[in-house]
């Protein structure tokens, strides 16, 4: 994986599409059944993941120290399943009712301390501007000029985040972009404020109770380690989907929405147990 993106790269080729093609033209070619929501499937997924998360916390509580890593992996991966459900809610594909999407989305993101509306709005921006250099907010790479203008320390951190410490990428993204509601305008600002206060107050109360009951060891055991596993998957999924060497990021004047949506994302397959959870 390349650590720095040159300003102009011809290493990747977009699908052969007409210059004036619109994303809507492509969407219109899809069969109607792909847009039909399946409520039974959606709620079954919620039930399965809730059960898995409960089992995960139980496993963490009862496991001897040498089995805790397995329990953390199971719980953290199940919490990633919560985020997948919230992802569908953010795209309004979980339910036909917006309030149901928002309610379920907030419930699913509360345990991982993720402000739902902030993520939803920023994620929609990412899809609207997929792989548009300097505009997309997911794994947007430095240009060669930007990288060379950075201090050696920042260059070192940039390479590490794009290398061995990729699994921390989503933590930096989460902390930097999702808690400042003043960056949003109008109705969106109020929505983000609500989501931020919900996770800060709710998460603060819940994990304060864990700390007061079990101490710092309990906080590490029940929150930090599963949370890090969750972010391992979050970082891995998003990085693999958008940062393969052959995936181009384009300057705005060169960028085409349809091409970006078709060639800017890689579909990845994971082990069956990851797909299930």
Write out the residue ranges for each language-model feature.
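Short acidic-hydrophobic sequence patches enriched in Asp/Glu that either
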Residues: 95-103, 115-118, 228, 254
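Acidic (Asp/Glu-rich) catalytic motifs at the cytosolic membrane interface
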Residues: 79-99, 119-131, 237, 241-244, ...
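Acidic, Ser/Thr-rich low-complexity segments on the non-lumenal side of membrane proteins
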Residues: 116-125, 263-277
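Non-catalytic, topology-defining segments of multipass membrane proteins
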Residues: 1-77, 85, 102, 109-225
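Select transmembrane alpha-helical segments in multipass membrane proteins
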Residues: 100-106, 274-277
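Juxtamembrane/interface helices at transmembrane-helix boundaries
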Residues: 69, 213-225, 229-241, 246-248
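Membrane-interfacial segments at transmembrane helix termini in multi-pass membrane proteins
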Residues: 231, 235-273
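Residue-level signal for short amphipathic helical patches enriched in basic/charged
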Residues: 80, 114, 231
């Amino acid at each position: 994986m390349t650590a720095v993106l040159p300003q102009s790269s011809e290493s990747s080729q977009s699908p052969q599409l007409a210059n004036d093609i619109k994303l809507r033209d492509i969407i219109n070619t899809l069969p109607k059944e792909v847009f039909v929501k399946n409520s039974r499937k959606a709620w079954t997924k919620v039930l399965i993941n809730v059960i898995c998360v409960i089992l995960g916390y139980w496993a963490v509580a009862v496991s001897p120290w040498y089995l805790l890593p397995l329990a953390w992996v199971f719980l953290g991966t199940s919490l990633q399943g919560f985020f997948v459900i919230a992802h569908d809610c953010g795209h309004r594909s979980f339910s036909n009712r917006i309030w149901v999407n928002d309610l379920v989305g907030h419930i699913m993101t509360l345990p991982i301390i993720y402000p739902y509306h902030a993520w939803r709005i920023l994620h929609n921006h990412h899809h609207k501007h997929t792989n548009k250099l300097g505009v997309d907010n997911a794994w947007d790479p430095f240009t060669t000029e930007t990288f060379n203008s950075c201090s050696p320390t920042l260059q070192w951190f940039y390479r590490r985040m794009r290398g061995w410490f990729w699994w921390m990428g989503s933590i930096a993204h989460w902390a930097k972009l999702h808690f400042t509601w003043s960056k949003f305008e109008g109705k969106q600002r109020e929505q983000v404020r609500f989501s931020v206060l919900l996770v800060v107050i709710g998460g603060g109360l819940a994990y304060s109770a864990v700390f007061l009951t079990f101490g710092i060891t309990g906080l590490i055991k029940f929150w930090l380690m599963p949370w890090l596993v969750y972010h391992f998957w979050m970082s891995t999924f998003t990085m693999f989907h958008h940062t393969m060497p052959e995936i181009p990021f384009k300057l705005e004047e060169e960028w085409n929405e349809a091409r970006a949506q078709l060639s800017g994302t890689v579909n990845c397959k994971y082990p069956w147990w990851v797909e299930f959870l």
